[in-house]
């Protein structure tokens, strides 16, 4: 059994929200680039001087060797490569988005941040899969978190409500919070909400309940966890003749508590990069488009298991389809 709760924000007859930040936020590409550089330097400083990691002990020779060796395919930890790297890429992407650059203009910042890290900030050879996951996964997670953080911004609020909104928005998109502090928007009061997107229809569902995971031949000896899942639908792909990047997306995630399974067991995201309504008749309609996908499934062996391979580990951090 599973307990579920959902919240629906009203649907619209027609789209009346804007798809580009250029009209709302001044473009500050040099500040965005500085933040990407500073982010990499901060992570490297932590790894080098606090954690004393060997891979962070870089010098001119290691950088030259990285360019000489060229990119290779690495076999680092599954969650590091396919969750941590895409999340890091989302911070690069959001450094640009929160400084007034639109979706397409922000893509080079995700790719550039990854290239800087892989070629300059580690003694290990540049990783092909890390660059792909950080760049493409970062683009998708970055745009999703940017738009979700926008839902909580309200410059009309004050007091405890304002603090709560800024904290929640900042947890979703840390780079946006940093830039709101830099520009003073975090405490500036105005007569408007100060959001980039307005009146976006949103569906949100949360589920909580036990989860049992076992291999078929050993179904009596699996693991039980407290599973928390959520699903969020943003926008409506059937409510407009044409839509641009991420006016519609769906995000699902699952978390396992009190078990040997990974905390993050599942992440699924699909967003429309471009789409168009191709047929409509009464209440029925058909839309076609190009969609970006992010899928991640992780599991672990039981602590007393005699097996050597986890039941499943599946991911696609860089995928596009129609």
Regions found by a protein language model. Give the residues of each.
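N-terminal targeting leaders of membrane proteins
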Residues: 1-84, 88-93, 97-103, 166-309, ...
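Alpha-helical membrane-inserting segments
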Residues: 42-46, 96, 116-120, 141-149
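Alpha-helical transmembrane segments that form the membrane-embedded catalytic/substrate-binding core
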Residues: 88-89, 121-150, 168-172, 176
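Small-polar-interrupted transmembrane alpha-helices in polytopic inner-membrane proteins
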Residues: 103-123, 135-139
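Beta-strand segments within the central parallel beta-sheet cores of soluble alpha/beta enzyme folds
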Residues: 106-110, 157-162
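Outer-membrane beta-barrel translocator/channel fold
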Residues: 125, 129, 147-159, 292-310
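A cross-taxonomic marker for long C-terminal extensions/tails that follow the last structured domain
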Residues: 316-322
